[in-house]
Design a protein with these regions (language model features):
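N-terminal "arm"/small-domain region of PLP-dependent enzymes with the aminotransferase-like
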Residues: 1-51, 407
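Conserved PLP-enzyme active-site core in the AAT-like
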Residues: 2-8, 27, 63-66, 76-286
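Short, glycine-/Ser/Thr-/acidic-enriched flexible segments
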Residues: 25, 157, 211-212, 227-229, ...
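Conserved N-terminal alpha-helix of the aminotransferase class I/II PLP-enzyme fold
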Residues: 33-78, 99
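Short glycine-rich or small-residue beta-strand-to-loop segments that form or flank ligand, phosphate
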Residues: 43, 70-72, 150-153, 332-334
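A short linear hydrophobic-aromatic micro-motif
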Residues: 68-70, 207, 320-324
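Conserved C-terminal alpha-helix-loop-beta "cap" of PLP-dependent enzymes
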Residues: 280-435
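Charge-dense polyanion-binding interfaces
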Residues: 432-447
């Protein structure tokens, strides 16, 4: 049998990695395959922890300064579902950002949740989401007291953090629950950005340790503050997690938190400063208005004049330099403690080698089109469907997410109408999941 995946991944060895995972293939873990166990006597059980796993979770909670932490060796996607299961009941309304991760929309299908959208302002200078206005949260909760919880993403994929403490005060004053997808900020609690971490103010915080820290891909955490229904928590873990959770993922989670606490994260600031000073003609996205409280310097989002971002990604990959993502305008490099000075120099040399083109392009006018929800995600998911060419699907209702990946934010989700704006956004994306062979899935017409 040909080992296709293995042979392909071997070609990436020796590259300069500015993508996930945060360990960059360089962490000398102090565990190995001999530690890959299941729930044998003495190894405890994640689905009913009473011994070493319970102790590990207590230690992690103390490191993050939260009341309780749970190991999630199944990615933040599972952490999101578990948090929503704990915070809401079927039929409940959840106030969300439209630029939420795909996992939230999947959770809405599985749990039967109704989604209420916050306004999604866009920064005119960068074309990126401009954050969440605390006043919009207050207005939405006042207008609809039936909303059970607020679900926010902070930091976002590009490293922008929300004004979470202000928002948390508003949410808690109205006796609602605040859930934060902090998948991209598991390291924040150990950096100068600690005051902006959701762990300081959210009821539930979901983190992906592997994105920026020394954990294996799929290692995640769910943090909780305040009272926890232990019976419901165990029930939810049994529902969403495998009965054979990976001990290697859990071991890497322990390792990552310990290493994250010990690392001097300010070291990465010098890398970032050197990159910006060495590349004066590169357009680096920074400020996004006063609704973004802080920006993570580990996320180096930039535009090379004259080039699409996905073009930059491809050209650098030919040189063994791997970026996290590229779209029609931007490219993204993610720094971590395991990038070397030589990595940074290779990236700088690679970008300098790209010849500037005389004709440049304008930043995107808006990150995602405005959409109209016709059905709830769960209703749309189970309706009869058909596949149509994208252009023929105008004004029809989507039965699947159309999602550029990365970052995994749907252009349109289950139950939303496909507009001309949606069509143009999908056409502009080269890697939208759900858009195969030029066709999309829509709810079947009665006519």
């Amino acid at each position: 049998m040909m080992r296709y995946l293995y042979e392909r991944l071997k070609t990436f060895r020796g590259g300069a990695n500015f993508a996930m995972p945060g360990h960059k293939g360089r962490v000398a873990f102090d565990f190995d395959l001999s530690d890959d166990w299941t729930e044998v006597t003495g190894a405890d059980n994640l689905l009913n922890p009473k011994d070493v796993i319970a102790s590990a979770q207590e230690e992690i909670a103390a490191a993050y300064g939260v009341d309780k932490s749970v190991l999630i060796p199944a990615g933040s996607t599972t952490g999101v579902k578990l948090a929503l299961y704990l915070a809401a009941e079927p039929g409940d309304k959840i106030l969300i950002q439209r630029n939420s991760h795909l996992s939230l929309f999947h959770a809405a299908v599985e749990l039967g949740l109704e989604l209420v959208y916050l306004p999604a302002p866009v920064d005119e200078a960068t074309g990126l989401f401009a954050g969440v206005d605390p006043a919009d949260v207050e207005d939405a909760l006042a207008a609809d007291p039936a909303i059970a919880a607020v679900f926010l993403t902070s930091p976002d994929y590009f490293g922008g953090g929300l004004r979470l403490k202000e928002i948390a005060d508003i949410v808690h004053e109205r006796k609602k629950v605040l859930i934060v997808d902090e998948a991209h900020g598991a390291h924040w609690a150990f950096t100068p950005l600690a005051p902006y971490s959701a762990t300081t103010c959210a009821d539930y915080t979901v983190q992906s340790l592997h994105k920026t820290m020394a954990a294996l891909t799929g290692a995640a955490l769910l943090h909780m503050n305040g009272p926890v229904d232990e019976r419901k928590l165990l029930k939810g873990m049994g529902l969403f997690l495998s009965t054979s959770p990976s001990y290697l993922l859990m071991l890497s989670s322990e390792y990552a938190v310990a290493a994250g606490k010990a690392f001097d994260w300010r070291k990465l600031l010098s890398y970032r400063k050197h990159m910006e000073e060495s590349l004066p003609t590169i357009d680096v996205a920074k400020e996004r208005g006063n609704l973004i409280a802080c920006a993570d310097p580990m996320k180096f989002l930039f535009h090379v004049p004259g080039y699409r971002g996905d073009e930059v990604v491809s050209l650098l990959a030919e040189k063994g330099i791997y970026l996290e993502m590229g779209d029609a305008y931007y490219a993204l490099a993610i720094l971590s403690p395991y990038n070397s000075e030589e990595d940074v120099e290779r990236l700088i040399r690679g970008l300098k080698a790209l010849l500037e083109r005389e004709e440049d392009m304008a930043p995107p006018k808006g990150a995602y089109p405005k959409t109209e929800a016709v059905y709830s995600p769960r209703e749309a998911f189970f309706m009869e469907t058909e596949r149509l060419p994208l252009r023929d699907a105008k004004d029809r209702v989507a039965a699947e997410n159309l999602t550029p990946y990365p970052p995994g934010i749907p252009i349109v989700t289950y139950g939303e109408r496909i507009t001309e704006e949606v069509i143009r956004a999908v056409e502009g994306s080269k890697n939208a999941i759900g858009f195969e062979d030029g066709k999309v899935t829509v709810i079947k017409s009665a006519w």
